[in-house]
Amino acid sequence: MADSGSDAPISNRPEEEVTVEKTPEMEAAAEEERLRYLEFVQQAAAQVLVLAAAAYAYAKQGAGPLRPGVDHVEGTVKAVVGPVYDRFHGVPLDLLKFLDRKVGESVQELDRRVPPVVKEAPGLARSAAAEVRQAGLVGTATGLAKSAIARAEPRARDLYTRYEPVAERKAAEAWAALNRLPLVPSVTRAVLPAAASLSARYNTAVADGAKRGSAVATYLPLVPTERLSRVFGYPLADAAASPAPEMQPIPSQ
């Protein structure tokens, strides 16, 4: 017999896996492939596909004598997961890219009409997508609420400073007019001590909760008991030249 044309030894070892390192150009292309605004939609679609595949594989594990039961489970899984799978499976990446571009155009249009905070939309969208994956919607809602409060607080403080004196004066005038009615002074003398006690207890509870780090307590307002005592305890000087006995300060008990 003629010798083989190749004297190289035959190796039974499997071929080594070749690892391809990503170049900066490849990473840039992959980054461009990601969605800027609708990344969370892509993540939701991927999670639905994984859950559907896992449920289908679980239904297939019991082949054999229990096949009729497995077929029943498989049919149930298809009936429940199938519509969700079909809905997300039919949304190609090109369509998501199109929607993402439309969102971007809307943000750019809004950028000319609203404050610069809109410029942070792409970063906020990525941050929201990460929060949804890590902590769920509850944590995201809490963070967004805190952010909204932080942005609205300066404006609210300005409005409060501007209109507080007017509101305080109107409240005192209304209180003085109300005390002219029969029986009102005697009723308020009976009610105010209990109301003052409850207000003080409420303020103490809120302050203690804030010291313990309660997130809810930090947003609860305190009852301005001293200001209420000053406003409602004494009639305005110009409310009447000679106030009637009903308008005299309510004695504390």
Swiss-Prot record:
Residues 1-26 are annotated as: Disordered. This is REF/SRPP-like protein OsI_017815. Residues 13-26 have a biased composition (Basic and acidic residues). Belongs to the REF/SRPP family. It comes from the Eukaryota. InterPro entries: REF (IPR008802). Pfam families: REF.
